[in-house]
Amino acid sequence: EKQEDERLKSWADYPSDDWLKQSLFALKQDTRLLDEFILKKGAEALRASFDKHQIQPEDMDYVLAHISSNYFKDGLREEFANVGLDFPVEKWYYNLSDVGNIGAGSIFIATEELMNSGKLKKGEKVLLCVPESGRFAYSCALLTVC
């Protein structure tokens, strides 16, 4: 919890009987920071990876991205486009509306769904992007269909 001046309120500022009632020792995330940073940092990290490995956005046939909420869907595409990774809408594959937010498992399920769809062709490139919101870290992988 924060004080009026935005500084964090210490557990020691609460009466001891409030410690359990208010879950003061539970780890919590300030989700307002997600809105401000997660998409931008992810786009910057992916751009750096593309540059380092001399990969071009037009080489991607599919982009699979884990998002925890549809709230992030358009924003993610926009932030990627802002750094020159303007993947056409038809290349994006999401399964959030079908399976819900299943966290780290979502990218594996989406990959399996795409594999079983019959759409993939030998040599196609599939980009996987997964954020870890606690530290604003992104993991990305580039797969080639065999």
Per-region residue spans from a language model:
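Residue-level preference for alpha-helix termini and adjacent loops
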Residues: 26, 33, 95-101, 135, ...
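Hydrophobic alpha-helical segments
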Residues: 79, 83, 99, 113-117, ...
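Cysteine-centered functional microenvironments
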Residues: 90-106, 129-130
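Conserved beta-strand-centric core segments of catalytic alpha/beta enzyme folds
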Residues: 1, 106-146
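Hydrophobic pocket-lining "lid/loop/helix" segments that shape and contact the acyl-thioester
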Residues: 1-95
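Gly/Ser/Thr-rich loops at beta-strand to alpha-helix junctions
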Residues: 66-71, 100, 104, 132-136
